[in-house]
Amino acid sequence: MRQSGNEQEVIILGSGLGGLAAGTLLSKNNRSVLLLREKRYQPSYPTQGYHFVPFSNFSEKRIGPSFLKKISNALNLQLLMGNREEVKQTRISSDQSKQKAAFQVVLPKSRIDIFPQRSLSQKEWKREFPKEFIEIEKFYDELNQTQHLLQKVDRKKNASSFFPLRKHSLISGLFPFDSLPKGKMDEKLSPFSRAFREFIQLQLISWGNLFSERFPVPLAGHIFSSETDALSIDVDLEKLEKEIVSEFLRSGGRIEEIDKVKKINLGWRKGFTLSLEGDPRVFQSKFLIFNSPLHQISSLLGKKGKELLKWGEKIRPLYVMIPLFLGVREKVIPVGMKDLLVSMLDLDKPYDNGNVLFLSLSPKGDETKAPEGRRALTVESMMDVGKWEETLLVDYQQEVMKHLYHIIPFLEHYTEFVDFQWASDHVPNWSYSHFLYKVTSDFYWREGVVPVKMSKNIYFVGKENFPYLGLEGEIFSGLSAAQEILKNESWPNFIRP
C-alpha cells in the first residue's frame, strides 16, 4: 500500500548499507518507505582531483564475487549481476587474483601478506615465524576443519547461505546440540608468540568492527574464510551503495535530507511521529528502522526507548576511527606494499594514538581516484571515544604521520597534501559510523549482539548487530529487518541463491 506526503509505512533513520538494503527490499514489495539522510554528512570526499572514501574495515574495500552475487540476488541488482560474458570474466579475474594478496599485516619486525591460496600463505608464515611454523600449520588446520564443519551443519539444517545464522529458541537454549568447537581464540593463541597473536588479532578486527580477545573459534574460521574470498573485482562500497540507492528510488522509495531528529513520539494508533530540529516538517510511520550508531540515537525515544538503552549497554564504542587523507606521488610507494594494509608500530602499546593504522591506496593508474602518477591514500587511525572533544587534531596528526613515515620512507618529500578537515567536520555527526566496538558480556555469534527487532514495530540495523562481520553483517541485518516487517514466516528465503 502506497501513501503520500509525510505519512508512510516505514521510516528509516540513517543511510547506511543496512538501511538501504532494508528500504530497497520493502519498496520492491510495494511498501511506502522514507529514508531520512543527514544533510551535513557526505560519505566521500573529492578534492584537488582526488577521491577519498573513509572506511570502517577492509570488507568495505574488497567485496568478494560470492558475496556480491548474494546481494545482487537479494535485491535484484541487474548491473551487479551482469551478463554471462561478464560473469565469465569475473571468474577469470578471480582465478588470477588467487595469486595476489588480499591485504598485508605489518608488525615491528614482520610484513606478512594474506593470500587466498594456502600454499602462498605458508611461505609467509615460514619466513616471518620460523620457530612456530609447525604449530601455526596445526592452528590453521583446526580453523579450516571448524569452517568445514560449520558448512556441513548448515547444509543439514538448510540454513541461509548468506550467513550461518542460528535462530534462538527455548529448546536450543536448554539443549544446545551444536557440534561446533566451544573454545575461544585467546585460549588457542596462548602458546604462540606475542607477534603471532597480534597478527591474528589484527586480521580479525580488519574485517569487522569488534575488538575482543575472546573471539569464538568458529567465528574466527568464518572471518578468515571471508577474507580469502574477498578477491579484487571492480566493485567497492561506494559503487555498491550507488547501485542500491538507484534501485531503492526506482522501486518507489523516497529520500529526504534533514539536520537532526529532535524527538520521536510513539502514539497508540498513529505509530511514530518524528519532529526535527530547526525544521517544521513532521514525519509519521507505522514502522521505524534505526540505521545510525546505537549510542547516537538511544535517547530519541525518551522513556519508551528502554530497549535501545539496554542494548547500548551491551555493546559500546571503544575507539572512533579517524580518517586522514593524503595525496601522494606513485614513486614513493615501496615495492611490495599492498593497496590494503594494517600496521602496528609497538606491540606493547594500545591501538590508539596512531599505534595501529589501516591504509587503503587507490588502485594504481585509476584516474577516477587520483591524478596521473598519483595515489589517494586513506589512513584510518583510532582514538579513545571519550577523548575526541579534548584532543588537538594537530598533535594527533603528528603521531599518525610518525607511524606513516615508518611504513613509507621519504613520504614527506612525495606528499601533495594532508587533509584532516573532513574528519573534523564529520566525526561529530550522528550518521558517522566508523567505530571499533567492545561487548560487555558474552554473546552467541550466530545470533548477533544486538537484535534486529527491538520492540513492536521498532528495528535496529547497523554495525552493532553483527559487529564482527563487517559489510556482510550490515547487509544481512537490513534484509532481516525488511523480512520481519513483511511478516514472511520463512527465514529469510530471499537470500538463498
Feature roles, as predicted:
Residues 80-82, 254-256, 416, 459:
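General small-molecule cofactor/ligand-binding pocket signal
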Residues 107, 229-232, 262-372:
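Mid-domain catalytic core of redox enzymes
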Residues 197-207, 410-468:
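A glycine-rich dinucleotide-binding beta-alpha-beta segment and adjacent secondary-structure elements
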Residues 463-489:
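A conserved FAD-binding loop/helix module that cradles the flavin
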